[in-house]
């Protein structure tokens, strides 16, 4: 009550921010006449002037009015477009850590030039982030003439670039890039084996276009660089035969309910759970197939891999639908982005799910991967010193932007009043009645020459509706993942009088639908258009444009409500751009996913009773409340999921930050001998503590065991017992000192033999190689810990606290293992001549070059609710060659190729054969 009264008196926070910014707009407008009077050279010189003033201590905020006036005038001269006042407001909002909600058609691309120019003056680099390659290239080419006129360099960073080109792209003042490529380059930089291989500068300012898509929809998407793991395709094929025999039951077993099925589904969380009966059936089948021993259980440690395969196969068959979640294209499973309806070539689900779907569809099963490096978009974008974003739909997620990223959302008013007519939702009893009503609405629009855009939630639904329109004899275009290549042409024609376009979700987002069609697209089709041809096309377009305006603009039909209000608003936002007329209406049915999953049976039955005649339509305030309630539940559920993930990922993020920071220190230093000396002392102290416990009696010392350990692990043949017999004054501390001094002396002897420069390079290489290998294993261990940690809740323990505690312990153990492994390797390496160490270094550098070449192969483009991966791994032979070049491999050691066999039975035997 009091808040409402205060808002009426003082205005909302958004209104107060806009009032403050409008005062600065007046200053910019006042500068306009003087900037119009400047010559081109004088206008260009402003950039150097601003940079000098920054160096002299002025702030970006102080420079902002003049900088914005400079960009506005340059844009008028170079692009023929003058920034509206609301675009200046948007630019000011984006200059700092804020999100600007700007409606479709309000010129976000032009608005972005203002904060990009201002922040690029610092010389630290600006990243403009888009959701796909096409938009990155388009926006860069659109704004390049403006920025280059003002003395700013512009580059595009997309997958597949040559390393040197990519490196130059990051050196540009303003770099346009996709979100996935920025994330993968960050991970690649932290796998580099020399400082020169890195691409990125410190992350300064990112302006994220379609920020809701990237920071909300993609928030849980981990970017993963991975290498191949063991092949288990035969097992996926075998277990795929088991799943069809399992029977679904209504809900999970509990004290109150005992079903007769083999599994139950949790559609909200996309989980499938075996019942006790189902578990028993699976175990019997596995025993029959010879995949499990009769006395074993699926839950025993040795069979967890089998359980993992069954879980993946069950989810593949029951929760992932063809033409909804994925399509089969050229013998491969291609994921469909649930938010945009676009396919994402090269993206793969993790945890064996992708392989299980490949087995289900009978296509070639590709190998599983082991994570080498990963980061989520949530944590990657929080690395930027300054982060800002723009979208047409942010206000509904304002709380999450503030909570997770510390970004305030400011709603920017439209340049012209919005006159779109958003009609009340209509509900039908079932999908067939709903489709019938949609077809009647489309027929009415066609009769009045009004273009229609029909939004569907999946490829499957778009094809069902398309079939219904074909049956009704209505010509139309379909824009979904299957027809992705024709997207630009379909969108260009979607504004024609009477055109009917069906689009999955927000396919085509980022491209405006022009009323009357896109005349520029028509001109582009002509090889060498004459002035007369262009003029004729413009005249024809103007007639069509006027006809569509008269008919009411673009009409939007939503075939069902989405889980998020934001997605609904995005669909509506395609109409009514820049003050154009338009209309929208959502058609719903009780069969819709939102109703089935998020409304209880009681509410659904109550609503069914409200329909008294076949095909009856219902629209009421109650309906609006029910839908709002269901969407609020989904949004809250999804927010909790993202927040929960972040709490877990923050633990891994702290560790990642520590490892990558240490790695960069290693890369930037040619001499790490002091670090090696400190590690050696730590390692030997720890080893000695195992056999000579601190402050213990001499009778408790295990001297023979200590001598053996020093001999086997560090090739130190020290007569410790003889020392003790010969010197009565030798006590714990002096003995410890003598052992460490002996280790240092032996290492010094090797260094004199090999040469300091070669030894420094070798130390750095071994340190990086060992760190990467152990970090990779640590990531796998963290994944396993994360997957099972929720079970601690049954023991009345907080899973998050348990995860933090155990992951910290694992991290500490990894660092101890790193120290031991590095010192053990350096101690055991055989060094006889300068030539030998140089040959080992040459082989190591060759192996690293091969690994780097694999990492820089073209990456899959684009993000979704899956995990994008990139391969980077040496062959088994290269691994063995690299280790053999560094040291002698014992016959009974595990083979370095990773097979799990002893060296003498694996590559050791092959080496013998070749000898």
Curated annotation (Swiss-Prot):
Annotated region described as Disordered, given as residue ranges: 849-915
Membrane topology, as annotated: Peripheral membrane protein
Keyword NAD: no
Residues reported in the UniProt entry to bind Zn(2+): 895, 897, 906-907
Compositional bias ranges of the Low complexity kind: 849-864
Record's function text: Part of the Sec protein translocase complex. Interacts with the SecYEG preprotein conducting channel. Has a central role in coupling the hydrolysis of ATP to the transfer of proteins into and across the cell membrane, serving both as a receptor for the preprotein-SecB complex and as an ATP-driven molecular motor driving the stepwise translocation of polypeptide chains across the membrane.
Protein name, per record: Protein translocase subunit SecA
Organism: Actinobacillus succinogenes (strain ATCC 55618 / DSM 22257 / CCUG 43843 / 130Z)
């Amino acid at each position: 009550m009091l808040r409402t009264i205060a808002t009426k008196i003082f205005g909302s926070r958004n209104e107060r921010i806009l009032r403050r910014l409008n005062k600065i707009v007046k200053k910019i407008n006042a500068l306009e006449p003087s900037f119009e009077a400047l010559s081109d050279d004088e206008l260009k010189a402003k950039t150097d002037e601003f940079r000098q003033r920054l160096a002299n201590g002025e702030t970006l905020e102080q420079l902002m009015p003049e900088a914005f006036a400079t960009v506005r005038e340059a844009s008028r001269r170079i692009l023929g477009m003058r920034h509206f006042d609301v675009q200046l407001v948007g630019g000011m909002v984006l200059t700092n850590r804020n999100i600007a909600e700007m409606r479709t058609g309000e010129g976000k691309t032009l608005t972005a030039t203002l904060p990009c120019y201002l922040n690029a003056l610092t010389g630290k680099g600006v990243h403009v982030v888009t959701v796909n390659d096409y938009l990155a290239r388009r926006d860069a080419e659109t704004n390049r003439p403006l920025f280059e006129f003002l003395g700013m360099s512009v580059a595009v960073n997309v997958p597949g670039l040559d390393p040197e080109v990519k490196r130059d792209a990051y050196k540009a003042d303003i770099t346009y890039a996709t979100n996935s490529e920025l994330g993968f380059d960050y991970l690649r930089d932290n796998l580099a084996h020399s400082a020169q291989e890195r691409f990125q500068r410190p992350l300064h300012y990112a302006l994220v276009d379609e920020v809701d898509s990237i920071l909300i929809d993609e928030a849980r998407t981990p970017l993963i660089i991975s290498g191949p793991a063991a092949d288990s395709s035969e097992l996926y094929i075998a277990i795929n035969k088991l799943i069809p025999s399992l029977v679904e039951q209504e809900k999970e077993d509990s004290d109150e309910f005992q079903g007769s099925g083999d599994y139950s589904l949790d559609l909200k969380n996309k989980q499938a759970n075996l019942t006790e009966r189902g578990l028993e059936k699976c175990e019997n089948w596995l025993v029959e197939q010879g995949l499990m021993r009769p006395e074993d259980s699926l839950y025993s440690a040795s069979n967890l891999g089998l359980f993992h395969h069954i879980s993946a196969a069950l989810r593949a068959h029951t929760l992932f639908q063809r033409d909804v979640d994925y399509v089969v294209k050229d013998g491969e499973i291609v994921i469909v982005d649930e938010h945009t309806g676009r396919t994402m070539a090269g993206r793969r689900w993790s945890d064996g799910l992708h392989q299980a779907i490949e087995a289900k569809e009978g296509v070639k099963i590709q190998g599983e991967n082991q994570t080498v490096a990963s980061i989520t978009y949530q944590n990657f974008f929080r690395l930027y010193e300054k982060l800002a974003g723009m979208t047409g739909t942010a206000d509904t997620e304002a709380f999450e932007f503030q909570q997770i990223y510390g970004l305030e959302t400011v709603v920017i008013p439209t340049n012209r009043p919005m006159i779109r007519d958003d009609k009340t939702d209509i509900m039908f009893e079932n999908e067939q009645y709903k489709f019938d009503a949609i077809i009647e609405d489309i027929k009415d629009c066609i009769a009045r020459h009004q273009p229609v855009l029909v939004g569907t939630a999946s490829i499957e639904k778009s094809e069902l509706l398309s079939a219904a329109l074909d049956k009704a004899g209505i010509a139309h275009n379909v824009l979904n993942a299957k027809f992705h290549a024709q997207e630009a042409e379909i969108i260009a024609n979607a504004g024609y009088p009477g055109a009917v376009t069906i689009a999955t979700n927000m396919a085509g987002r980022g491209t405006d639908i022009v009323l009357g069609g896109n005349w520029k697209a028509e001109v582009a089709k002509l090889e060498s258009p004459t002035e007369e041809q262009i003029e004729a096309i413009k005249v024809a377009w103007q007639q069509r444009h006027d006809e569509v305006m008269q008919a009411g603009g673009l009409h939007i039909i939503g075939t069902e409500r989405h889980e998020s209000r934001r997605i609904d608003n995005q669909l509506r936002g395609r109409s009514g751009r820049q003050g154009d007329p338009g209309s929208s209406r959502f058609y719903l049915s009780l069969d819709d996913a939102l109703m089935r999953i998020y409304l209880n049976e009681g509410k659904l039955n109550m609503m069914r009773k409200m329909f008294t005649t076949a095909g009856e339509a219902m629209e009421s305030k109650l309906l609006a409340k029910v839908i709002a309630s269901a969407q609020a539940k989904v949004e809250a559920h999804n927010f909790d999921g993202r927040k929960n993930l972040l709490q877990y990922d923050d633990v891994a993020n702290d560790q990642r930050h520590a490892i990558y920071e240490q790695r960069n220190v290693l890369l930037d230093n040619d001499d790490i001998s002091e670090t090696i000396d400190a590690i050696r002392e730590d390692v030997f102290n720890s080893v000695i503590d195992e056999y000579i416990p601190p402050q213990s009696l001499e009778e408790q010392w295990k001297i023979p065991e200590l001598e053996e350990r020093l001999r086997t692990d560090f090739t130190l043949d020290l007569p410790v017992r003889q020392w003790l017999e010969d010197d009565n004054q030798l006590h714990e501390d002096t003995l410890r000192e003598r052992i460490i001094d002996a280790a240092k002396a032996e290492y010094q002897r090797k260094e004199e033999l090999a040469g300091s420069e070669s030894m420094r390079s070798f130390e750095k290489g071994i340190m990086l190689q060992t760190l990467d290998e152990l970090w990779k294993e640590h990531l796998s261990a963290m994944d396993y810990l994360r997957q099972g940690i929720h079970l601690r809740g049954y023991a009345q323990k907080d899973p998050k606290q348990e995860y933090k505690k155990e992951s910290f312990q694992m991290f500490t153990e990894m660092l101890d293992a790193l120290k031991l492994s590095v010192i053990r390797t350096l101690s055991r390496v055989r060094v006889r001549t300068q030539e030998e160490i140089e040959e080992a270094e040459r082989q190591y550098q060759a192996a690293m070059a091969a690994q780097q070449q694999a990492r820089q192969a073209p990456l899959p483009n684009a993000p979704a609710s899956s995990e994008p991966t990139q391969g980077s791994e040496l062959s088994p032979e290269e691994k063995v060659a690299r280790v053999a070049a560094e040291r002698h491999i014992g016959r009974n050691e595990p083979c370095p190729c990773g097979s799990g066999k002893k060296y003498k039975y694996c590559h050791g035997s092959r080496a013998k054969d070749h000898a």
